[in-house]
């Protein structure tokens, strides 16, 4: 069973990548399970053509003793199995705790043993790597982590913070960094910035997803790009990315950038923006 996590800043394109990679891997004949670990519960939206009941909602409505696998596992596009952890009501409780509860419930119900997926993908919010959102790292639920980022300074800052969490648990032999997914959707689209960041943290770029209006059109229809435009160039980019990650054997314990290193990278971005728009 191939298991990996996708982390990244909120709104950076994690779910876009996860949905399309899952669809691509399923298209290739693999049985895929996607576990959304984001309180927005939208990780599987394009696979399911809408939202599904979350583990936490079902937990609150039925109680854990009455829950069944079919209450929380749904089958979406290309036969991809979908689960959403969900979160507390706004202003109440801890979203990270929701991830912990969801992961525990999947274990209790024997989801992995019964479904026997070939691939499990965890889609995890990475703005703050607290105890809940770091659960897949702590419990070694996955073999490696992939971080989605753009050239935006705050996205890189979040990616660097995630690397700190991976380093903490990686040094205990629990997890490793597989690489960076470059989402080319920020104002500054400069691969050299990401190359510099990747070199600094001792990792690799797994692939670049360029900006495309096809992705936007697909998501407005609540579809993956693989479903909406299967023969498009951007769909093939997602297929290449999915295969690259599935086959990847090269992992590292990252070396997060220091504050000074981040400042220097930010200055490089500012210089590129100035040159581009002045």
Curated annotation (Swiss-Prot):
It holds the Pfam family Fer4_NifH. Signal peptide: none annotated. It is an enzyme of class 1 (oxidoreductase). Its EC number is 1.18.6.1. Its cofactor is [4Fe-4S] cluster. It comes from the Archaea. One of its GO terms (biological process) is nitrogen fixation. It catalyses: N2 + 8 reduced [2Fe-2S]-[ferredoxin] + 16 ATP + 16 H2O = H2 + 8 oxidized [2Fe-2S]-[ferredoxin] + 2 NH4(+) + 16 ADP + 16 phosphate + 6 H(+). The reversible ADP-ribosylation of Arg-97 inactivates the nitrogenase reductase and regulates nitrogenase activity. Binds 1 [4Fe-4S] cluster per dimer. Keywords: 4Fe-4S, ADP-ribosylation, ATP-binding, Iron, Iron-sulfur, Metal-binding, Nitrogen fixation, Nucleotide-binding, Oxidoreductase. [4Fe-4S] cluster binds at residues 94, 130. GO terms for molecular function: 4 iron, 4 sulfur cluster binding; ATP binding; metal ion binding; nitrogenase activity. ATP binds at residues 8-15. The modification ADP-ribosylarginine is found at residue 97. PANTHER family: LIGHT-INDEPENDENT PROTOCHLOROPHYLLIDE REDUCTASE IRON-SULFUR ATP-BINDING PROTEIN. Belongs to the NifH/BchL/ChlL family. HAMAP family: NifH (MF_00533). The key enzymatic reactions in nitrogen fixation are catalyzed by the nitrogenase complex, which has 2 components: the iron protein and the molybdenum-iron protein. NCBIfam families: nifH, PRK13230.1. Homodimer. This is Nitrogenase iron protein. It comes from Methanococcus voltae.
């Amino acid at each position: 069973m191939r298991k990996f996590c996708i982390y990244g800043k909120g709104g950076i394109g994690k779910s876009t990548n996860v949905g399309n990679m899952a669809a691509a891997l399923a298209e290739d004949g693999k049985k895929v399970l996607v576990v959304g670990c984001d309180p927005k519960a939208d990780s599987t939206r394009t696979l399911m053509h809408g939202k599904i009941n979350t583990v936490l909602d079902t937990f609150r409505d039925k109680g854990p003793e009455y829950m069944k696998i079919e209450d929380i596992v749904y089958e979406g596009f290309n036969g991809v199995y979908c689960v959403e952890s969900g979160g507390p009501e706004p202003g109440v409780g801890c979203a990270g705790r929701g991830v912990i509860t969801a992961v525990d419930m999947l274990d209790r119900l024997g989801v992995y043993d019964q479904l026997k997926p070939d691939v499990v993908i965890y889609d995890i919010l990475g703005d703050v790597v607290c105890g809940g959102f770091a659960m897949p790292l702590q419990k070694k639920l996955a073999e490696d982590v992939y971080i989605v980022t753009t050239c935006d300074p705050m996205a890189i800052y979040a990616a660097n913070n995630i690397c700190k969490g991976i380093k903490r648990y990686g040094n205990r032999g629990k997890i490793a960094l597989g690489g960076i997914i470059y989402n080319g959707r920020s104002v500054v689209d400069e691969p050299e910035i990401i190359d510099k960041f990747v070199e600094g943290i001792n990792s690799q770029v797994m692939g670049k997803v360029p900006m495309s209006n096809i992705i936007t059109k697909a998501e407005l229809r609540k579809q993956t790009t693989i479903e909406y435009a299967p023969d498009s160039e951007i769909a093939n980019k997602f297929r290449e990315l999915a295969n690259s990650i599935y086959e990847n054997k090269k992992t590292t314990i990252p070396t997060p950038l220091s504050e000074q290193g981040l400042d220097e990278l930010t200055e490089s971005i500012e210089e590129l923006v100035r040159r581009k728009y002045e």
